[in-house]
Amino acid sequence: MEWQQLLSRKRLGKQQLEEHQFERTSFLKDYDRIVYSTAFRRLKDKTQVFPLSKNADVRTRLIHSLEVSCVGRSLGRMVGDQIIKRHQLQAIEAADFGDILSAACLAHDIGNPPFGHAGEDAIQTAFQKWYARKNRSGALINPLEKADFDRFEGNAQGFRILTRLGLPHRPGGLQLTCATLATFAKYPRESFIPQRTLARHPGKSLQKYGFFQAEKDLFTEVAETVGLIGRSPKVAWWCRHPLTFLMEAADDLCYSIVDLEDGFHMGYLPFAAVQDKLQSIADIDLNQYEGSPAETIKRLRAKAINRLVKEVAQLFLDHEPDILAGKFDQSLVELSRFSPQLKEIETMTTNAVFHHPNVVRIKIAGFEVLGDLLTDFLTSVLEKQPRPKGKLLKFMLPPEHQIAPDEDNYSKILKVTDYIAGMTDLQATLLYQQLRGISL
């Protein structure tokens, strides 16, 4: 892969390359388009760790995305300066690397359904149960299409939002640059790849998938524009864009550190334990500082992230030749010398925060909410003779999700998952309560 091509300013859905503006580059415009999108605004009421939390100090998906974007920008500028010198790149600034990463990081969770990963699991499980029950008489959709829903993936939904749903009547949706879209694609493959094929190619980028069958052609255009290395001539499957490794690292180090801080703010983790874990990375002289426990944790969090950013940037530069050749497919954070400390943090956070009864209880409720909503709407739009409730449910779909008489089954299911996954935690909860007569 070549950096000059990897940083393509071409916009998906546009034939002409837009004129370069130094004061507001194409990649800065990408960032702005994401910020002003409806899907991004909805992240303010989507779960990061604590569903439906009333504590203003803990993070929602929106705040998490903004923080990851800041870290991504720093990583991009740090490595960009060195890469430009190393490859003698022309007409490219270090800020371009930072701006691409900032935009991609900002959008990295934009496709997540309500209730976080529990929401993804709920959609997968509900679809599989519904399909097994309703499909005894024959195939509703083909195996490639079915895999999109069997393994419903927020990353693929995110690519669909950016390239189609964000502005559905315009080719390319938000019409972001191919560089930003390729960087966004953490898992640059389709959902249906034989397990025996995947088993021969272990790596981080293969653990999930990054686009639905509906957007396969769009992703192919992005991949070919920026020059991603194809992994197989038989399936839609590429090596990652190099900057994707930095986007992943920005996300990994942010949630590792800030989930710890949020656990402290919620009262699930004691001050001494959180201070000890953060200090193992930050390594500062705490005797030089005064302040409350909350201020101490805030200072340690900032110092820890700063050290991790510098470490990850250097690791990327060390592995850059293999990354460009498509020979590297590991987590930069896991290669860090701080990996043991981060694993200890993950274990403590998982046990004390993610498994806390208050968190688990709401996640279970969210699982039921999304699963039942998906089942209700799928039955409504796909049954030939739905029951009276099913007939009425069709009118609950917003205009952009209304089903046309001539649409195929795959498109109908996509419109339902678009609607359900696009809700906020509160929207899904209220709709569930209303449809069951719990509240009106």
From Swiss-Prot:
Matches recorded under PROSITE patterns: HD
Enumerate the UniProt keywords alphabetically. Hydrolase
Cell membrane recorded as keyword:
no
Q: Name one GO molecular function term.
A: dGTPase activity
Q: Which residues form the HD domain?
A: 61-256
Which GO biological process annotations does it have? Answer: dGTP catabolic process
Q: Which family does it belong to?
A: Belongs to the dGTPase family. Type 3 subfamily.
Instruction: From the Swiss-Prot or TrEMBL record, give the protein name.
Output: Deoxyguanosinetriphosphate triphosphohydrolase-like protein
Protein source organism: Synechocystis sp. (strain ATCC 27184 / PCC 6803 / Kazusa)
